[in-house]
């Protein structure tokens, strides 16, 4: 199927438009589990964002700094990424779409959420015994992220690497790249 994928990750400025448009208060953009998560935890913005004295600030390793509007949005959950994509009239790319297109855009600043559940590759067979049981636990309720981040070791920074997190986690350096079917 034909699709297009954004040349850049969603920026803080673009994500701020979602917040200002009431994106965190509009259930139409959220998975039902995501909507429950937002309301239960009273989520109103990405992790480490703080609205202080009429300006958005971002807590960083260097302390609290003004939000860098042109930087990729960071520390968001799959639920937030999905809702932003729905609000923007787009979608998250699948894992396969991201990998096929990855030579056409710059990646590596943020782990990028995909619309793909973390499942074994075709033909995968779980090993017998404890190792199989241990590995099998990771393939439950996880979503795939592709790319790498500024904090990723060189050995894991490759376009084929599959990372995975639970959809509610706002893990280190997670971001958004949009796709759409054409």
Model-derived regions, located:
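Short, well-ordered junction/capping motifs at the entry into regular secondary structure
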Residues: 69-70, 74, 96-107, 116, ...
């Amino acid at each position: 199927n034909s699709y297009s994928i954004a040349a850049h990750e969603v920026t803080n400025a673009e994500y701020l438009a979602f917040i200002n448009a009431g994106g965190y208060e509009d259930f139409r953009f959220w998975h039902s589990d995501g909507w429950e998560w937002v309301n239960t935890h009273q989520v109103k913005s990405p992790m480490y964002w703080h609205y202080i004295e009429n300006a958005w600030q971002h807590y960083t390793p260097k302390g609290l700094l003004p939000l860098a509007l042109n930087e990729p949005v960071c520390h968001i959950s799959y639920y937030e990424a999905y809702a932003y994509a729905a609000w923007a009239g787009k979608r998250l790319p699948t894992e396969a779409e991201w990998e096929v297109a990855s030579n056409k855009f710059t990646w590596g600043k943020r782990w990028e959420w995909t619309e793909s559940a973390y499942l074994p590759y075709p033909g995968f067979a779980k090993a017998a015994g404890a190792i199989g049981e241990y590995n099998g636990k990771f393939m439950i309720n996880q979503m795939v992220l592709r790319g790498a981040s500024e904090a990723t070791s060189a050995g894991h920074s490759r376009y084929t690497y599959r990372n995975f997190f639970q959809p509610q986690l706002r893990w280190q350096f997670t971001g958004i790249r949009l796709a759409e079917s054409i």
